[in-house]
Each structure stands twice: as C-alpha cells, then as structure tokens.
C-alpha cells in the first residue's frame, strides 16, 4: 500500500461523497493520556497488574517528552519524501534515515523513568546509557528489522518507546491531504510496521475496522472478515474468554494459522490498543494452545526466542 497527496479538487470530492477515511493519524497527546489511564484501570485486579503499571508509567513519560521536548519540524522534507518515493511508505522504519533526536529522546526517557524503575530496570537503563552512538543505532536497526533476539526484550521496550515517540511525531508532520492507495495492507502504509491489534470503530467510522500501527500509531482501514496476514476469509473464527459480547476477541485464520486481536469500541468505548492487548494475555495463552501464532506486535511485549 502507498499514500499520496490529494490535490484540492479531489479533497473536495472526497469530502462531498462522505468517503470513509482509509488512513487515520494519531492525536499523540490524547493517545498517551488515554493509554496510561486505561492501563491503570486494567491493572486493578489483573494478575499482570504490576506490568500494566510499568507500561502506564512509561506512557506518561512519553507524554511528558511529547509536550516538553518535541522534535524539529520536517514537514517540507517529508512532503518531498512522499513525492520522491511515489508514496511508498514514506517513513519506512527499515529504510528511513533517522535523525539523532530519537537517541536524545531515549536518554531523556530513561532518565525520567528512573523513579519508577526497579533494580532490574535500572540495570537495563544503565546499559543503554553507557552504549555508544553506533551501538544504539545498531540496536535500533535490529529492532526495526524485527531481529528482536539481537536486542533483548528488556532493552527493546525502552528503545521502542523512544523510537515510537519519534516516529509518531514524524507522522504528525505528513501532509493531511494524504490518502492510501489500493494495495498490500498487512503492514502500516506510513512506516511499514506491524499492527498491534485491529479496532472496530464507532462514531463517524461506525463499524469500520482499522489496524493500529505499533510504531507510528497511525491506523489504516482493512475490510472486516478478512485475515490481516494472508487476506483469506474462509476459515476465520472469533474467540473470547468472558462472553460472546466481550470487547476484545481474537480473530484466528485457519489458512495461515495466525491470529490478531480485535477491539470493539461499540462494546466498550474505552478500549485502547496497547492497554487492552496487554490486559488480555490469558487470551493469547489460549490461542497459542490452539496452535495459532500471534501476528500483532505490542511495544511492551517483544517475543524473543
């Protein structure tokens, strides 16, 4: 899938036809605030409550840095980047040339997180702080290219938090008159990263399914009742632990034997991709027992072999 900048006449035409937006950009301030709040809510009476609190604290640090240490303005450069690449995932995490700002965000993030960290986390933070520029860039390359075992789950969470904060702000600077083109929809059309979950919206986009990016936090539309990995639709099943009306379900595909969680805003308007994914880890355990492999990537849950 690619994105392109719409000319003014097409913008007016799309608006007049009530066209469903194929690409939604995040509101970072609201996103981090809602995420932290939801994580704390789900942490109550959850056996993984301590980890949800950890994720909430880190999300609040991200919000702090967003408000007080924003990245530079690259809007003109990014617009040119879309045109030069013909809209082919302009912020592709595997090829986009990062500035040093992500490393600055990492150091600020780890410093601000120290009051919440236990001894194990402090040891990880110390390793990151002592790493050279080349070592940090190598870790980022491994992480963004899905070589998680080369990074380690302990370091990956902090690295991804900084990288995601950087990429989310970059995505905010893309022209708003952009639209996705028809094509491969398995990964984010902005940065080529995997989704965390899919979300079935309510409100203006009632009933539409969007996949939520694990890196730049953008969302892109994908039709329902179609596997987000292999595009097949003949062997899809939906699973939940509590009830058939649960706000979080797992969509499994018998063709490729993968699954991705689905959040239903109509069932619970407060569902949030990262938080509700972490809050339903027992559902992951059930799906793995049934022989399905997780296709979503949660930035607080890196699977390292």
From Swiss-Prot:
Its main location: cytoplasm. InterPro entries: FdhE-like_sf (IPR024064), FdhE_C (IPR056796), FdhE_central (IPR056797), FdhE_N (IPR056774), Formate_DH_accessory (IPR006452). GO terms for molecular function: ferric iron binding. Signal peptide: none annotated. The keyword Membrane does not apply. GO terms for cellular component: cytosol. Keywords: Cytoplasm. GO terms for biological process: protein maturation. Pfam families: FdhE_C, FdhE_central, FdhE_N. It is found in: Cytoplasm. NCBIfam families: FdhE, PRK03564.1. HAMAP family: FdeH (MF_00611). Necessary for formate dehydrogenase activity. Belongs to the FdhE family. This is Protein FdhE homolog.
């Amino acid at each position: 899938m690619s994105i392109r900048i719409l000319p003014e006449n097409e913008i007016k035409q799309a608006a007049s036809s009530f066209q469903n937006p194929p690409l939604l950009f995040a509101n970072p301030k609201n996103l981090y605030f809602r995420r932290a709040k939801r994580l704390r809510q789900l942490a109550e009476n959850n056996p993984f409550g301590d980890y949800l609190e950890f994720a909430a604290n880190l999300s609040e640090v991200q919000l702090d840095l967003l408000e007080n240490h924003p990245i530079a303005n690259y809007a003109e450069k990014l617009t040119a980047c879309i045109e030069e690449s013909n809209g082919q995932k302009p912020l592709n995490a595997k090829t986009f040339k990062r500035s040093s700002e992500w490393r600055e965000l990492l150091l600020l993030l780890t410093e601000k997180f120290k009051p919440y960290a236990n001894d194990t986390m402090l040891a990880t933070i110390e390793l990151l702080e002592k790493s050279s520029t080349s070592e940090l860039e190598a870790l980022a390359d491994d992480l963004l290219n899905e070589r998680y075992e080369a990074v380690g789950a302990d370091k990956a969470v902090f690295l991804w938090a900084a990288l995601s904060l950087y990429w989310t702000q970059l995505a905010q600077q893309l022209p708003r008159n952009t639209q996705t083109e028809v094509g491969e929809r398995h990964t984010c059309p902005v940065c080529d990263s995997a989704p965390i979950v899919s979300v079935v919206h309510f409100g203006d986009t009632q009933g539409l399914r969007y996949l939520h990016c694990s890196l730049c936090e953008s969302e892109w539309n994908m039709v329902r009742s179609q596997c987000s990995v292999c595009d097949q639709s003949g062997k899809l099943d939906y699973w939940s632990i509590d009830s058939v009306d649960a706000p979080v379900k797992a969509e499994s595909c018998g063709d490729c034997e993968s699954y991705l969680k689905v959040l239903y805003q109509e069932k619970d308007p407060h569902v949030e991709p990262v938080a509700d994914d972490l809050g339903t880890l027992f559902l992951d355990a059930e799906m793995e027992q049934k022989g399905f492999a997780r296709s979503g990537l949660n930035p607080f849950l890196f699977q390292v072999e």
